[in-house]
Amino acid sequence: AMTDVLSAEDIKKAVGAFSAAESFNYKKFFEMVGLKKKSPEDVKKVFHILDKDRSGFIEEEELKFVLKGFTPDGRDLSDKETKALLAAGDKDGDGKIGADEFATMVAES
């Protein structure tokens, strides 16, 4: 579970901070949720939790539910937010985010 890696309180605060539509900012979110200061192993654990279909990638349809991955009451991202998040993370242009790309996004935040 996400709470094995991150504090439930931090998750609640971070998800709550972006409850308004079109407000999602992944850099601020990863920082607030405490992911930025976690070890590479922990960042990888979070990646695997978000990779719902265990494909080794977070696809666009999984990104839409990224906040739900942190907590069940997180909102769905809008199409615009989802596409912006994908564009920010998908460095090699394959239309999805791999574990290394995810780690880079966290490091950049």
From Swiss-Prot:
One annotated GO molecular function: calcium ion binding
Top-level taxon of the source organism: Eukaryota
UniProt entry tagged with the keyword Translocase: no
Residue positions binding Ca(2+) 1: D51, D53, S55, E62
Function summary: In muscle, parvalbumin is thought to be involved in relaxation after contraction. It binds two calcium ions.
Similarity-based family: Belongs to the parvalbumin family.
Protein name stated in the entry: Parvalbumin, muscle
Organism: Gallus gallus
